[in-house]
Design a protein with these regions (language model features):
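Conserved N-proximal alpha/beta basic substrate-recognition cap immediately N-terminal to
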Residues: 25-153
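ATP-dependent carboxylate activation and anion-phosphoryl transfer catalytic cores
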Residues: 15, 21, 27-30, 242-243, ...
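N-terminal amphipathic/basic-hydrophobic helices that include classical n-h-c signal peptides
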Residues: 1-12
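Phosphate-binding site of ATP-dependent enzymes
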Residues: 158, 165-169, 176-265, 275
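Redox-cofactor binding/interface segments in oxidoreductases and associated redox assembly factors
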Residues: 19, 97-98, 211
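Short glycine-rich anion-binding loops that position phosphate/pyrophosphate groups of nucleotides
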Residues: 23, 100-103, 175-177, 300
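Structural detector of well-ordered beta-strand residues that form the stable sheet scaffold
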Residues: 49, 125-126, 171, 209-211
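Anion (oxyanion) recognition and catalysis
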Residues: 42, 119, 164-165, 276
């Protein structure tokens, strides 16, 4: 039955939010997007329950976890305090943020099964656990060919070499890397082409991606954040270190915030409805020049850097969106 608005307002002030993340003691406080989210949730008066992947379990068909109450502050010396731990059914939580960083491995997939059971029983899981499994960061982008550079996904060394012959300057990358690991650029005269392809494909067994090199990388690999299909109007351009062809901050890139271009907005428009449909509430697009190269759904970052440059509160906007979704269900 419909609750009166005053009751809904009271309910929204007491939400229980869970977070599945890497150990909080080892985060980089200044840059951590998950911390920004937890600070924003706490700002709303919500109580935070913390868990790592191994804390999740299922008993007699019900997903549960050992959780710890958590309070956070924006202090690089002292950013979190644990409260009591307890054992709960996941559906006692109103919302769960799945913020475990890749690798996207079997343990990650098992976690999504456990979270999916909670999602189906009424807890809002961000992002939708099924979509976390369905949307590989590199391959998902290929569903929008109008936005992408020339690319190929293949395990076949001959086909991958032919792509190099056609495009001359090519980036080869694994489909599961993070932070720019194992990304190779093969220029026209690359002597090690066969070795690069053999290594990445494990001698023709593993699918990898080949992508025409985009010279615009010198102006940065832009990270564009989207909240429920709506872009944040500023991007973080990660400028590669001198002599590097990878802009990732983890690979030594340097971040510069800037407004979205018309082409950026067009790309956002192309992908928006698919993101909403799939329950991907918080997503990071990677755009180089005019091209979409990746759609990051597992645990996109860069909130803190864009917030600082333009005095925004992106995590606050995300929490507002989550709150609206929960209010809609309560009504």
């Amino acid at each position: 039955s419909a609750l009166p608005e005053s009751a809904i307002a009271r309910f929204l002030m007491t939400l229980q939010i869970g977070v599945v993340m890497d150990p909080i003691e080892s985060i980089n406080v200044k840059k951590d997007t998950t911390l920004a989210m937890l600070l924003a949730a706490q700002q709303k008066g919500w109580s935070v329950q913390y868990m790592t992947q191994p804390d999740l379990y299922s008993h007699e068909g019900v997903s549960r976890a050992k959780v710890r109450a958590l309070t956070v502050e924006d202090n690089p010396e002292d950013w979190f305090k644990y409260g009591a731990d307890k054992d709960i059914e996941l559906n006692e939580l109103d919302v769960i943020l799945m913020r475990k960083d890749p690798p996207f491995d079997l343990d990650y997939i098992y976690s999504t099964y456990l979270l999916e059971q909670a999602h189906l029983s009424g807890t809002l899981v961000v992002n939708n656990p099924q979509s976390l499994r369905d949307c590989n960061e590199k391959i998902f982008a290929t569903q929008f060919p109008q936005c992408c550079p020339a690319l190929l996904v293949s395990a076949n060394p001959g086909r991958l070499k032919a792509f190099h012959l056609e495009h001359k300057d090519v980036i080869y990358k694994p489909l599961d890397g993070m932070g720019g690991s194992s990304i190779f650029r093969a220029k026209p005269e690359e002597a090690n082409l066969s070795v690069i392809i053999e290594t990445l494909t494990q001698h023709g067994r593993r699918q990898i991606m080949a992508q025409r090199f985009i010279p615009d990388i010198i102006n940065g690999d832009k990270r564009i954040l989207m909240i429920d299909g709506v872009p944040v109007p500023y991007a973080l351009a990660r400028i590669p270190a001198t002599g590097e062809s990878r802009g990732n901050l983890a690979a030594g890139g340097n971040g510069v915030a800037q407004p979205l271009s018309d082409q950026d907005l067009w790309i956002c428009q192309q992908v928006s409805s698919a993101l909403k449909e799939k329950g991907l509430l918080f997503v990071g697009l990677d755009v180089i020049g005019d091209y979409l190269t990746e759609i990051n759904v597992t645990s996109p970052t860069c909130i803190r850097e864009i917030d600082a440059a333009y005095n925004l509160n992106i995590a606050g906007d995300l929490m507002d969106t989550i709150e609206q979704k929960i209010a809609l269900k309560a009504r």
